[in-house]
């Protein structure tokens, strides 16, 4: 998608391309003959996808100078509005001397691991119950979420997201105060699917309403997740094909 820069001693391990040898165009030359080449191409174009640049180009051309400036101003304004609403309840990282951020900001969730055994993943999964896809998690700082509202969201949507995070902070506070169980709580079990909430049996220490409808706005337009909590790390480290055996496809064709 974009340029990747490495130091000289790593150059030999970068992907190569049939049309480029050691940074020079050589049409028709097979770079696998090059002593530095140890890996083949990873994209059709030598330096990534040129078509991706058309999106940025079109965005800039359509907005024009004033439009790009205005969009940037609104993006920074939106980010700082959200930062100001969340400040005091969450620690905000990397602000300037005036306590402000740029177009995005980082919410530090690491203190909650010690105080309530709540991690960034728990907050990310819980946001789904509030109708939001989680923002960037654990980048560039582990145990954090990075929020970038951009210029396109209106104030009502920004408030809705802030309300969700503030509500989650209150849920964490209940755990910190011992009023909610550290193992069996709405964050650790999030997200809650429709089948789980409507099941005949409910063994949790919190109510079904707390699980699925934590704020009023959620009752008006509920997004139901299709799956509950999965072990992301286990899945990444234990890749298992869930396809039918090859023989079954052969039998079907016959």
Q: Residues of each region from the PLM?
A:
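Short alpha-helical interface patches
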Residues: 13, 22, 111-113
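Gly/Ser/Thr-rich helix-start
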Residues: 3, 49-51, 65
